Amino acid sequence: MKNIICFLFLSIVGFTYAQKGDPEIIKKPINYSSERVNLSIDYLKSHYNITQNTATISPKMIVLHYTAGGTVETNFKYFNKTHLESARNTLKKQSTLNVSSQYIIDRDGTIYQLMEPNMFARHTIGLNYCAIGIENIGSKKQPLTEQQITANAQLVRYLTKKYNIEYLIGHSEYGAFRNSKLWKETDPNYFTIKEDPGKDFMNKVRLLVSDLHLKDKP
């Protein structure tokens, strides 16, 4: 009975938000310096065989993540650095370009934009050239909130309308795209197992945007 009530509630909320306008987004840009631009352009070429003179993407996909801890401020400070920290050896061997995402959502559902949605961010191996990343403050021990579920659904709806998005996945699901036409990673051994943001979270977000018919597989 509890699951039925939850399903009905989320369905009603989903319908309600389908009728609303764009979500409130607070711009909080990280330092996208000329060095970061050049590292991003190099990454596009070396990992995707994409040669261009701008650090931009053509979004087809949205990938939801969690930060595995911290606050908006601590994660902002981390993403704001151009270079990866030395402890992340596996990633650093591929490029010194720091990880980042286009958006980060706080536990109360506040949405922050860290860069323009069509700017390149390193957040999902093999798919960064076409994927918008949304980070959520939380972890396995600090489950994501109902406010974040709602905010993610609003943001997904807004971005889908703006960029004609086709796919919505969680970071843990990105492996399904290996060996597909969308997967452009040039190093066949460059892959890491992820578990964020969790099946329950993805199911709830997908329920709220089910009318968009976004795919989760190639």
Description of each model-found segment:
Residues A68, C130, E135-K141:
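Cell-envelope and extracellular/periplasmic
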